[in-house]
Amino acid sequence: MAAKKGKKTSTKKSDYYKVEGNTVERLKKVCPKCGAGVFMAEHLNRFACGKCGYLEYKKNEKAESEE
């Protein structure tokens, strides 16, 4: 019989917010299509939404400075 898999750990949602006094600040980018509550994953050259698949590419600062 196969060994049982361990329980999968989820990410802590509290890592996505910063609380200062009475204000709450989101630390990650929010998907413009899905709205508040759906954060976008940050990759090397883009931001991606895992829910709807929306992509937003980062500006290449090296290419802009060379022009």
UniProtKB/Swiss-Prot annotation:
<dbReference type="GO" id="GO:0006412">
    <property type="term" value="P:translation"/>
</dbReference>
<dbReference type="GO" id="GO:1990904">
    <property type="term" value="C:ribonucleoprotein complex"/>
</dbReference>
<keyword id="KW-0689">Ribosomal protein</keyword>
<dbReference type="GO" id="GO:0005840">
    <property type="term" value="C:ribosome"/>
</dbReference>
<dbReference type="GO" id="GO:0008270">
    <property type="term" value="F:zinc ion binding"/>
</dbReference>
<dbReference type="Pfam" id="PF01599">
    <property type="entry name" value="Ribosomal_S27"/>
</dbReference>
<dbReference type="InterPro" id="IPR002906">
    <property type="entry name" value="Ribosomal_eS31"/>
</dbReference>
<feature type="zinc finger region" description="C4-type">
    <location>
        <begin position="31"/>
        <end position="52"/>
    </location>
</feature>
<keyword id="KW-0479">Metal-binding</keyword>
<feature type="binding site">
    <location>
        <position position="34"/>
    </location>
    <ligand>
        <name>Zn(2+)</name>
    </ligand>
</feature>
<feature type="binding site">
    <location>
        <position position="52"/>
    </location>
    <ligand>
        <name>Zn(2+)</name>
    </ligand>
</feature>
<comment type="similarity">
    <text>Belongs to the eukaryotic ribosomal protein eS31 family.</text>
</comment>
<keyword id="KW-0862">Zinc</keyword>
<keyword id="KW-0687">Ribonucleoprotein</keyword>
<dbReference type="InterPro" id="IPR011332">
    <property type="entry name" value="Ribosomal_zn-bd"/>
</dbReference>
<feature type="binding site">
    <location>
        <position position="49"/>
    </location>
    <ligand>
        <name>Zn(2+)</name>
    </ligand>
</feature>
<dbReference type="InterPro" id="IPR022845">
    <property type="entry name" value="Ribosomal_eS31_arc"/>
</dbReference>
<dbReference type="GO" id="GO:0003735">
    <property type="term" value="F:structural constituent of ribosome"/>
</dbReference>
<comment type="subunit">
    <text>Part of the 30S ribosomal subunit.</text>
</comment>
<feature type="binding site">
    <location>
        <position position="31"/>
    </location>
    <ligand>
        <name>Zn(2+)</name>
    </ligand>
</feature>
<keyword id="KW-0863">Zinc-finger</keyword>
<protein>
    <recommendedName>
        <fullName>Small ribosomal subunit protein eS31</fullName>
    </recommendedName>
</protein>
